[in-house]
Design a protein with these regions (language model features):
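Conserved catalytic-core motifs of eukaryotic protein kinase domains, centered on the activation segment
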Residues: 31-34, 140-141, 168
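Catalytic histidine-centered segment of alpha/beta-hydrolase-like enzymes
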Residues: 158-174
Length: 185
């Protein structure tokens, strides 16, 4: 959801940005937004967040847990370690996640409501839209649609990565950012 937030910021204050590199931003076209918000069916992502385990005995236990099952098991080990070390706080009886499950669930529920899609043609900052494998009904499937709405944008498709692509292959993502930085100096 950081990509959507950056787009919103660039629409308001474009002078703050030389370029945007966005990985599967959560910006839905109107027909998808309506389908998501009017179904009356609870979001599976929100429900999953509410059920997510929020405490562990130790950082190592959390890393072991996340590395053994989807979706975080695809992350490179150093990225997963950083995710846990910075996403949890120590407490007297172990560690607890910094972002409460309810807050995360609300973020998923609200992510489909913003109307940033309608303003994409107004974006005047160079944009690189990066997507992992295109799977129906995922943010990867929408990246090309977003690119079509942003004049002059560049679509980068990495079919060997999923939605956690920057954490699966941080080096490749860093190289792209360096290329964009050099191209927009």
């Amino acid at each position: 959801m950081g990509g959507a937030a950056l787009v919103m910021a660039a629409l308001r204050e474009p002078e703050l940005f030389r370029a945007l590199v966005l990985y599967e931003p959560i910006i839905f076209p109107p027909q998808v937004r309506v389908g998501i918000t009017n179904t009356g069916v609870p979001s599976p992502l929100a429900n999953g967040a509410r059920r997510r385990r929020s405490t562990f005995a130790s950082f190592d236990e959390a890393i072991s847990n996340y590395s053994s099952k989807p979706p975080l098991n695809v992350m490179r080990s150093d990225a997963l370690r950083a995710y846990v070390m910075h996403g949890f706080r120590a407490q007297h009886d172990g560690i607890s996640i910094k972002c409460s499950p309810e807050h995360e669930a609300r973020t998923y529920e609200m992510g489909a409501i913003h109307e940033t899609w309608n303003d994409l043609p107004k974006l005047r900052v160079p944009v690189w839209l990066v997507s992992g494998e295109v799977i129906p009904h995922t943010p990867g499937a929408i990246a090309a649609l977003i690119a079509n709405e942003v004049s002059g944008s560049t679509l980068v498709q990495w079919n060997d990565l999923g939605h956690f692509g920057p954490m699966q292959d941080p080096q490749r993502f860093a190289q792209l950012i360096a290329q964009v930085d050099a191209a927009t100096q």
